[in-house]
Amino acid sequence: MSHTPVLAERILVADDDRTTRFAISSMLKKAGYAVTAAKDGAEALRNIQKKSFDLVFLDIWMPKLTGLEVLARVRAGESRPKIIIMTADGTPETLLRAIREQAYEYLSKPFPPKEAVEVAARALKQDASPRIEVISAQPHWVELLIPCTREAAERIHSFLMKLEADLPDDLRNTIGLAFKELLLNAVEWGGKLDPNRKVRIAQVRSSRMLLYRVADPGPGFSFKGLTHAAVGQPADEPIAHTNVRDQLGIRPGGFGITMIRAIADELLYNEAQNEVIFIKYLTASAGVSGTAEVPS
């Protein structure tokens, strides 16, 4: 994705590794941004307090102040630029603290410097959205209230998928597709893309299963009335919903519920069908490192 700033947006790059700091700063400068560099957390915080930045790339493990300490102090202050956390530390505790402190995105090192330009373009084109509320931030139980925007849904999907890094790639990607579709359905249809409304989501992990619960603020729905989805079509017209989606001007698709049903081991809706529980059982070979056992 290309992004040419009309006015040079200001970006701070903070990393104690000189090579990384130089590579990212250089790529961002070539893309037309006004870049300031900092070699440790204390210098990064001083820069943020003195100047107005649109975006900050922040390494976690830096001398004097860690990136997470800087993030917490920034959130308590008046200047609150969007912050991209970048680190090789992929532990659940670090990731969850980044979510709690309202990090905008989380980049896992190593990554190609050009990815910083793509992330910057994506972050800077988005308006500021309401806070993501953290209800629980334990590795085995994450529960959040997120604003009903596609941007928030995409961010949280990216964060939570990183929590499942111990799963095989194909399994994690498959589960991720289902969770993303549930989340987008919730913000689009239940929340009507109203950023002042919230979707409540929970991710629960034990050694034997991965569970997602998604509750949207809408009145619910009936499968019989889903003219815009493949699941609501007669057998002789399985893709009639595509015409409906064109007429309504909504994103291509409509196969989401059908796909989710195929992926889930259990899919449970409440009576109004504005809450859903997705369950995937994990085999011993799927990997369980870093998880917490749910007490029996």
Segments predicted by a language model, with ranges:
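Receiver (REC) domain active-site loop signature in two-component systems and cognate sites
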Residues: 62
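Conserved beta-strand-loop-beta-strand hairpin that lines the nucleotide-binding pocket
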Residues: 117, 121, 134-142, 187-296
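Two-component/phosphorelay signaling modules centered on CheY-like receiver
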Residues: 18-36
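Active-site beta3 strand of CheY-like receiver
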Residues: 51-57
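Alpha4 helix (beta4-alpha4-beta5 surface) of REC/receiver domains from two-component response regulators
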Residues: 69, 90-105
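Acidic catalytic/metal-coordinating carboxylates
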Residues: 39-43, 66-69
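C-terminal output helix
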Residues: 93, 111-120
